[in-house]
Design a protein with these regions (language model features):
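Extended, charge-enriched "interface" segments that sit outside catalytic cores
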Residues: 27, 343-501
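C-terminal catalytic/motor cores of large multi-domain enzyme assemblies
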Residues: 9, 42, 52-349, 353-356
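Short, hydrophobic/aromatic alpha-helical segments in well-folded domains
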Residues: 219, 363, 504-508
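Hydrophobic/aromatic-lined pockets within catalytic cores
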Residues: 18, 133, 155, 368, ...
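Structured alpha-helical segments in the cores of large, soluble enzyme domains
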Residues: 94-99, 118, 190-191, 282, ...
Length: 508
């Protein structure tokens, strides 16, 4: 045995054992570094020495022979039935998309991102669509309003409408486009389940009012879905808009096509991720707003990051009602009342200030007294009517209070109502198409009689009542036609808009 295999502290122990065995059993083996090769020799027999008594040495247990384990089973091959891949040639619009995307790789781009609170956008869009549904019909989408804000921002910042090109000598030039040709990314599903992306544009979009832009937008989308677009609809796009937020995408960095200045991406309308688990009641109490993420991907050869950042800031300014943005939309759509205004949530100390409940009672009283002054009673003319005593800000109320529930003191037959419902009933009762003035009466019973019938909300007539009204109108029209044909040349007075009095008399 080689003592060099163990720690030197063990060497004296092994030397003692060697001496006890007479030096015959465990001669120290020199280390390989010091050992020299020796010639083979037959060792001489040493005389037997008397063996000293030694302690019995415990023998090591003999390991049982290992039982051979069975060979692992060969795993079954993961095979599928043989099938051929389907190869579809890209033709027509699909091939054009490939060409456009490959060309976009030659455009050096950068992207600016901005999160915008969408509370005011949601409130004013809701007010617009409710009015349109009750009058001439139609619907305004979020993309309509955001797209119009983008167009106004580009018109205010011409530096965002600059494209890159080369002159006849091959030298780079910056093209300051005279008009904003606003492209709209339209996703068109096909019968086979595939989808096609087309980006037609609205020429000279900066010259359009919101109503004109709304009509042009709807027309180009309709023609796109019906396959009626022409080459001219795609030519000359300078700035385009894509809205993947409609399918839940929060943030998008789209490709910028060659020849365009910028493409604006619109994300999903959602609460921030950290607040999505909160209840609606807590969200309302805390004054949390949904946000919308806007991205501006631009040609970095002619547009710089600071300009893109200022551009998105201006878009946010418009979406928060800056420069009478929503007032212009309401006027273009001939909506007779003012839009909702942006304001920070107003916290009121009930111990030292008039509570919001008392302020709401003041607002209700103001509508009863002055509401008839804002009623839209002129069916042939248009005027946006307002009264300072009917504005929320006069009472320290904001758009953040609209969904909060307050005691009403019995208004509308309810003890507690959201401020939104209170305002809707007040507007319907006093500021709609019917003007009612009765607060001059000194008789409280008379005032209570009007309030009970006006402030509970209108009840829509059922189908039978609607058919009865229609039948009465048809009878009146038929009778007038009879008089016109029976008594020719006779002087008489026609209904001339007095038809609405007929169902009123019938109900009485």
């Amino acid at each position: 045995k080689d003592k060099n295999l163990v720690d030197p502290s063990w060497w004296p122990i092994f030397e003692t054992i060697d001496k006890a065995l007479g030096g015959a059993g465990t001669a120290s083996t020199p280390s390989p570094a010091a050992a020299a090769p020796a010639a083979p020799a037959t060792p001489a027999a040493a005389p037997a020495a008397p063996a000293a008594p030694t302690a019995p040495v415990a023998s090591k247990p003999t390991k049982a022979p290992a039982t051979p384990s069975p060979a692992p089973a060969t795993p079954k091959a993961n095979t599928v039935e043989p099938a051929e891949d389907k190869i579809v040639p890209l033709r027509g619009p699909a091939k054009a998309v490939v060409t456009t995307m490959e060309e976009s790789l030659t455009v050096p781009t950068a992207t600016t991102v901005r999160a915008v609170p969408a509370k005011l956008l949601i409130e004013n869009r809701s007010a617009i669509n409710k009015y349109l549904a009750s009058t001439r019909g139609g619907k305004v989408s979020f993309t309509h309003i955001i797209g119009y804000a983008v167009i106004r921002a580009v018109a205010a910042m011409p530096s965002m409408n600059v494209t890159y090109n080369v002159d006849e000598k091959g030298k780079p030039v910056a093209v300051h486009n005279a008009h904003v040709n606003f492209g709209l990314a339209i996703d068109i599903p096909r019968p086979d389940g595939s989808r096609n992306l087309v980006v037609p544009n609205i020429k000279g979009a900066e010259q359009l009012s919101f109503r004109e832009f709304w009509d042009a937008y709807n027309d180009i989308v309709k023609r796109g879905r019906n396959g009626a677009l022409t080459i001219e609809d795609f030519r000359g796009t300078t700035v385009s808009l894509t809205n993947p937020g409609g399918i839940g995408t929060v943030h998008s960095v789209p490709r910028l096509s060659k020849g365009q200045a910028a493409i604006i991406g619109v994300g999903a309308l959602e609460y921030p991720a950290e607040f999505r688990g909160l209840s609606e009641k807590l969200i309302t109490q805390q004054g949390l707003s949904k946000i919308i993420t806007l991205t501006s991907t631009y040609d970095h050869r002619v547009i710089q990051g600071a300009g893109s950042g200022e551009f998105l800031k201006l878009v946010e300014h418009y979406l928060l009602g800056g420069d009478d943005f929503y007032d212009a939309i309401f006027r273009d759509l001939r909506i007779p009342f003012e839009p909702v205004r942006w304001a920070r949530d107003n916290h009121i100390d009930d111990e030292h200030e008039i509570s919001k409940v008392a302020r709401i009672q003041q607002l209700i009283h103001a509508y009863r007294v002055h509401g008839h002054l804002t009623a839209a009673t002129n069916p042939v003319g248009y005027k946006m009517r307002s009264h300072p005593d009917l504005k929320l800000e006069r009472y320290g109320l904001t758009l953040w209070d609209l969904d909060r529930v307050y005691p009403t003191g019995g208004f509308g037959g309810a003890e507690r109502l959201p401020l939104r419902t209170i305002l809707e009933r007040l507007h319907e009762a006093y500021s709609g198409s019917l003007a009612v003035e009765y607060m001059y009466s000194e008789d409280p019973e008379v005032r209570a009689w009007f309030q009970e019938r006006l402030e509970h909300g209108a009840t829509k007539p059922n189908r039978e009542e609607q058919l009865r009204v229609l039948s009465k109108l048809v009878e009146a029209e038929a009778f007038e036609h009879f008089l016109q044909t029976k008594y020719l040349g006779q002087k008489r007075f026609s209904l001339e808009g007095g038809e609405s009095l007929i169902p009123l008399l019938d109900a009485v």
